[in-house]
């Protein structure tokens, strides 16, 4: 299965089954950062602040803490066997072919749905500069651009993600710096409110909405971390993975503190949490207070953030299809690479699915309600993927203790933290039953596994036998 796949270095001529290690440490670090900073931070943080107040800071820290251990488990597994292309490979190897099948296709589905949402968002943001541009023309242009750039080389994907992530970083650092200056200079808003760190505890304390508000924050905040595992799909195309992957994963806590915690502290220090409008971006509102041309600036940042997410989706779905096809769990055509060592057919198929979904949304706006539920289902399914990573780690510790002993990148508190993280995911699922919209999505989620199960029984096993 996995050992049949050979990953060659850049200077070697690729074969039909080889991926090139063209992603450098610089690419991997920024891909990891880009994966950890979603569009939700820019657009959804207003809602999370209004739900939980200052306690939202602890919510992001707790989720980030848990996911750091998921990423450490993934890192140790990927480095235990450099033949692994992604987490679906080690799931198949350690838990059985069914696990690779369910993980690979679930991850593919998650990113296709997320990609559709991103493309629709990009077309909406593009209206800011091109108000007369037709939605379907804009969508087609975006998808063709992403396809064209990804078909070029894996290095092109790395370069795009590098600059997309850099834009997000600059925007967040600018917000933190501007906010700090406003606090230090005792900036006063037009309504007479003075910027101060005291807003964090003076306006009802750290938990103004009580424990229920604190818990409500988890329901939305956990979705902001979707994509944090993306670096795991680059393993087969990373130069010097033994150095690059640990470096990228180890910096996750610093990134979360800087990009989530510091940004939220600054936002709630300049504007008291009770004055934050849920439907508006707190980032935009802060820049508006200073008098900067925030509308165009933030529109550009959020557009590139959505483009980064869509780009990541196109990349990861094609690599998942490639791995599944290599293992006999997807059509053989997806196992073929182009002359540039890119899974071109997988890329084209994923982009066709993106385009089909976007066209359906635009032709029939009534589908949007169902689509909103599907995106929530997709976010829930990401938690399934994270859980499979943890289950794979437990199987690895049980079946291959010698590899763990030899590992230079051991997961801290390995077995214990696997169970703690899985208990946390169960806790989040219980919280999702408390709200009507997320409860409906949770009830629909088993349908995906029924479909996958049918596919496994009728097609997956047969391909595997061949």
Task: Map each language-model feature to its residues.
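Helix-loop-helix connectors at the membrane interface of multi-pass transporters/channels
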Residues: 4-12, 89-92, 119-139, 171-174, ...
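TM-loop-TM module centered on a large, flexible mid-protein loop between adjacent transmembrane helices
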Residues: 89-92, 96, 128, 201, ...
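Helix-loop-helix junctions that connect adjacent transmembrane segments
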Residues: 14-19, 56-57, 131-134, 166-300
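C-terminal membrane-solvent junction of multi-pass transporters and transport-like membrane proteins
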Residues: 164, 333-344, 383-436
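Membrane-helix boundary/coupling elements in multi-pass transport proteins
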Residues: 83-84, 106-121, 225-238, 293-332, ...
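Extracellular loop-to-transmembrane helix junctions
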Residues: 20, 43-138, 254-257, 261, ...
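Membrane-interface "cap" regions at the ends of multi-pass membrane proteins
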Residues: 1-46, 50-55, 68-72, 83-84, ...
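Membrane-interface loop-to-helix entry segments
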Residues: 123, 136-195, 226, 249-253, ...
């Amino acid at each position: 299965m996995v050992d049949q796949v050979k990953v060659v270095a850049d200077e070697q001529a690729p074969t039909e089954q080889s991926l090139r290690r063209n992603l450098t440490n610089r690419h991997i670090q920024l891909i990891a950062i880009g994966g950890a900073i979603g569009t939700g931070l820019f657009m959804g943080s207003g809602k999370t602040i209004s739900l939980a107040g200052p306690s939202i800071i602890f919510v992001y820290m707790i989720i980030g803490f848990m996911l750091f251990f998921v990423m450490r488990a993934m890192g140790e597994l990927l480095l235990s066997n450099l033949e692994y292309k992604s987490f679906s490979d080690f799931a198949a190897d350690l838990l059985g072919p069914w696990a690779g099948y369910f993980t690979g296709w679930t991850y593919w589905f998650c990113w296709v749905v997320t990609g559709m949402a991103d493309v629709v968002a990009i077309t909406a943001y593009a209206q800011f500069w091109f108000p007369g541009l037709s939605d379907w023309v804009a969508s087609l242009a975006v998808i063709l651009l992403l396809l064209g750039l990804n078909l070029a080389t894996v290095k092109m994907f790395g370069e795009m993600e590098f600059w997309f992530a850099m834009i997000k970083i600059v925007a967040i650092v600018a917000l933190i710096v501007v906010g700090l200056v406003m606090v230090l200079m005792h900036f006063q808003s037009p309504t007479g409110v003075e910027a101060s760190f005291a807003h964090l505890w003076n306006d009802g304390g750290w938990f103004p909405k009580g424990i229920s508000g604190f818990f409500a924050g988890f329901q939305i905040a956990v979705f902001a971390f979707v994509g944090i595992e993306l670096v795991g799909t680059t393993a087969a195309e990373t130069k010097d993975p033994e150095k690059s992957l640990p470096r990228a994963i180890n910096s996750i806590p610093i990134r979360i503190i800087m990009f989530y915690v510091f940004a939220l502290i600054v936002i709630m220090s300049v504007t008291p949490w009770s004055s934050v409008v849920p439907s508006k971006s707190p980032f935009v509102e802060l820049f508006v207070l200073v008098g900067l041309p925030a509308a165009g600036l933030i529109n550009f940042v959020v557009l590139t953030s959505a483009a980064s997410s869509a780009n990541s989706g196109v990349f990861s779905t094609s690599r998942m299809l490639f791995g599944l096809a290599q293992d006999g769990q997807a059509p053989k055509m997806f196992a073929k690479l182009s002359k540039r060592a890119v899974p071109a057919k997988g890329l084209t198929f994923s982009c066709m699915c993106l385009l089909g979904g976007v066209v359906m949304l635009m032709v029939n706006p009534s589908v949007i309600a169902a689509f909103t539920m599907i995106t929530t289902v997709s976010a829930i399914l990401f938690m399934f993927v994270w859980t499979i990573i943890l289950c794979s780690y437990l199987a690895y510790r049980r079946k291959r203790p010698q590899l763990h002993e030899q590992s230079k990148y051991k997961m801290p508190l390995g077995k214990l933290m696997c169970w703690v993280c899985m208990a946390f995911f169960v806790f989040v699922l219980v919280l999702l039953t408390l709200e009507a919209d997320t409860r409906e999505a949770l009830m629909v989620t088993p349908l995906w596994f029924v479909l996958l199960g049918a596919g496994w029984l009728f097609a997956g096993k047969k391909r595997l036998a061949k």
